[in-house]
């Protein structure tokens, strides 16, 4: 009985290989990256950073494009390789995909969070910040700003918070 089952199993393997078709042809995938001696670490005080954007009346955000005051924040990196670094923020995009959406749709409505570079220009999600040079000790501080931005008129009050993730680009 075992020989019969084994023979049937082998027969199935050989017969199915004759019918295998590759309808897509060959697909090439190019993978690339860098291997570095060491990478930056985030200063322990900045690992779970909270940026308090403050309390604002809805009258501050009456029309689409209205913003609140800029709130400065920084990320301190240590142990970086020589050269320069840039930061790239990611997160859930708002209807304006350059802005960070709030965490919960039940929160404040028609408002998003805008990130800005140290020169106060907008830093869109997924876009690298300007580079900053690493000092001789392997440290660098990158300065940013954040603010609320109305996506449309009729902002409704509520909690307005979001999470952003950052990646370090080495140059």
From Swiss-Prot:
Localization terms from the record: Fimbrium
Cystine bridges: 40-80
Pfam families per the UniProt record, alphabetical: Fimbrial
GO biological process, any: cell adhesion
Disruption-associated phenotype: Deletion of the operon under classical laboratory conditions does not result in any major effect on E.coli capacity to form biofilms compared with the wild-type strain.
Keywords: Disulfide bond, Fimbrium, Signal
A Gene Ontology term for the protein's cellular component: pilus
Triggers of expression: Expression is negatively regulated by H-NS and subjected to cAMP receptor protein (CRP)-mediated catabolite repression.
Gene3D superfamilies: Fimbrial-type adhesion domain
Leader sequence segment: 1-20
The UniProt record lists the keyword Phosphoprotein: no
Matches recorded under PANTHER family: FIMBRIAL SUBUNIT ELFA-RELATED, FIMBRIAL-LIKE PROTEIN FIMF
Function: Part of the sfmACDHF fimbrial operon. Could contribute to adhesion to various surfaces in specific environmental niches. Increases adhesion to eukaryotic T24 bladder epithelial cells in the absence of fim genes.
Family the entry assigns: Belongs to the fimbrial protein family.
Note: The operon is cryptic under classical laboratory conditions, but is functional when constitutively expressed.
Protein name: Uncharacterized fimbrial-like protein SfmF
Organism this protein belongs to: Escherichia coli (strain K12)
């Amino acid at each position: 009985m075992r020989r019969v089952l084994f023979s049937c199993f082998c027969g199935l393997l050989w017969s199915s290989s004759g019918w295998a078709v590759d309808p897509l042809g060959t697909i090439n995938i190019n993978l690339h990256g860098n291997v570095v001696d060491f990478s930056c670490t985030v200063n322990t005080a900045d690992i779970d950073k909270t940026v308090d954007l403050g309390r604002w009346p809805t009258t501050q955000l009456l029309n689409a494009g209205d913003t609140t005051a800029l709130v400065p924040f920084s990320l301190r990196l240590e142990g970086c390789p020589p050269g320069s670094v840039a930061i790239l923020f990611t997160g859930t995009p708002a209807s304006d995909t350059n802005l960070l959406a709030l965490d919960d749709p039940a929160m404040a409505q028609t408002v998003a969070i805008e990130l800005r570079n140290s020169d106060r220009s907008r830093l869109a999600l997924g876009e690298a910040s300007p580079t900053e040079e690493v000092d001789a000790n392997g440290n660098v501080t990158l300065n940013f700003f954040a603010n609320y931005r109305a996506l449309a008129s009729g902002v409704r009050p509520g909690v307005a918070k979001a999470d952003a993730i950052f990646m370090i680009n080495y140059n």
